[in-house]
Amino acid sequence: MTLPPPPSRLKPPRNTSSLSLRWRVMLLAMSMVAMVVVLMSVAVYAVVSRALYDDIDNQLHSRARLLIESGSLAADPGKAIEGTAYSDVNAMLVNPGRSIYTANQQGQTLPLGEAEKDVISGELLLSLRTANHQRILAVHLTNGSSLLISKSLAPTGQVLGRLGTVLLIVGGVGVAVAAIAGGMVARAGLRPVGRLTQAAERVARTDDLRPIPVFGSDELARLTEAFNMMLRALTESRERQARLVSDAGHELRTPLTSLRTNVELLMASQAPGAPRLPEEEMAGLRADVIAQIEELSTLVGDLVDLTRDEAGGVVYETVDMAEVVDRSLERVRRRRNDIEFDVNVVGWQVYGDAAGLARAVLNLLDNAAKWSPPGGRVGVRLTQTDPVHAELVVSDQGPGIPEAERRLVFERFYRSTAARAMPGSGLGLAIVKQVVLKHGGALRVEDTVPGGNPPGTSFYVMLPGRPLTPGGNGTAPVPAAQFDPDMRSAGSRADRRVIKNTETNGKSRSASKEL
């Protein structure tokens, strides 16, 4: 087994540092301007240099043409060549008899190379080249003579040198100006980013969620608006969290206080020398304690479900809503076997949170059963309304919900005056709303019998999905044994209608009729 190296030989992690965005923008501007300056300088230098050399070539050709066309080379070649000494060129005339006439500028000598010798020998008719800082033109004449003319490139080199100096200075100034301008632009452009940074640090340090002022409509302004949207969402989330904690504390305080009072009374009655409570009162206290514990358990469970949905991370899967309704009905019947359930469901698939959908349906059925009088009827319908939507309707024959309170029943911990005398946490319908909206659905509340006495309440839940057809793609049929033993399954999820559910000798009995 290979042992790890001793600690002294372990290499410490290298600290990687990066330039700030402002410096990167400034360096990018400098680099781009420098590249453009270099390219432009090279182009200008090449164009000017080519123009100067072309001008020298044109001057040499013009001087040679003038000497040849004037006839002075044939009449008096010596005088013609000497006349060039007063200009800025060097000249040489080589006759066939090898007589040579020359005229050079002071300190200059017309160089002879292989190209000029080839022209003199007649192998070449024309030669133009650069040698010894001179531009040399050699022309073979028709009479066998050869004319050589050269011009110094020193003045041209001086001009090009000054041009290079000017281009270097101008380019350097341009790069410096680009750096300064880039820094100013980066500073001005990144000012909103600085405000965002300060705001983020302020939020982390002080929990101050005030929005940032937005200026303009550019990308940084949109970034600021997005950050403000995040701040607003965070503010709403914290407000909901604070409201949930406050409401939960308020709702928990009442049963806890009552539970504490009853427990203290029971403990005091068991103390040595304390008067004994009648057995009936003891039984009542114990029943109250159990009821309060159940109420606390229900409240805590609802809170867990509520926070679970908000926290996210739930697993989405294909859910058979007919199966969900059947399982929820099975649980509700155990608690209320003195009411009838009128059920009519179709096979419908929803892609979503199976546990959340089951809890929402169970809460709707529990709410309907709670408000239904003994012998009442609860209607449960799941019907397809269009190719991609189905509607679940849960109706009861209870006292109904006033129209002014229908928006409030879905608020957390809201309980009407009539509901406060009944068990419940005030979170059931809030969970229903949260689950339905999370699945892209909609819900509303109406009277079961408008104008009736009592009017009853009907909850309408619209859920997106697809129909579940026997033998088609979708979830496999669930065996009928998993449901109410008295319920019979037809096909994958055939429509069924429960006619009556009555209590006989403490046991529930149901009769079903398949449609």
From Swiss-Prot:
- What CDD domains has UniProt attached to this entry? HAMP, HATPase, HisKA
Membrane protein topology class: Multi-pass membrane protein
Annotated EC: 2.7.13.3, 3.1.3.-
Which one of the record's GO molecular function terms can you name?
A: phosphoprotein phosphatase activity
What sequence ranges are listed for the domain Histidine kinase? 247-467
- Mapped to this chain, the residue ranges on the Cytoplasmic side of the membrane are 1-24, 187-515
Key word Secreted present in the record? no
Keywords of the record: ATP-binding, Cell membrane, Hydrolase, Kinase, Magnesium, Manganese, Membrane, Nucleotide-binding, Phosphoprotein, Protein phosphatase, Stress response, Transferase, Transmembrane, Transmembrane helix, Two-component regulatory system, Virulence
Q: Which compartments is it annotated to reside in?
A: Cell membrane
Region Disordered, annotated ranges: 468-515
Q: Name the principal localization, coarsely classed.
A: membrane
Q: How is it modified after translation?
A: Autophosphorylated.
Q: Which residues cross the membrane?
A: 25-45, 166-186
PANTHER family assigned to the protein according to its UniProt record, in alphabetical order: SENSOR PROTEIN CREC
Task: Explain the purpose of this protein.
Answer: Member of the two-component regulatory system MprB/MprA which contributes to maintaining a balance among several systems involved in stress resistance and is required for establishment and maintenance of persistent infection in the host. In response to environmental signals MprB acts both as a membrane-associated protein kinase that undergoes autophosphorylation and subsequently transfers the phosphate to MprA, and a protein phosphatase that dephosphorylates phospho-MprA.
The protein's name is: Signal transduction histidine-protein kinase/phosphatase MprB
User: Which organism was this protein described from?
Assistant: Mycobacterium sp. (strain KMS)
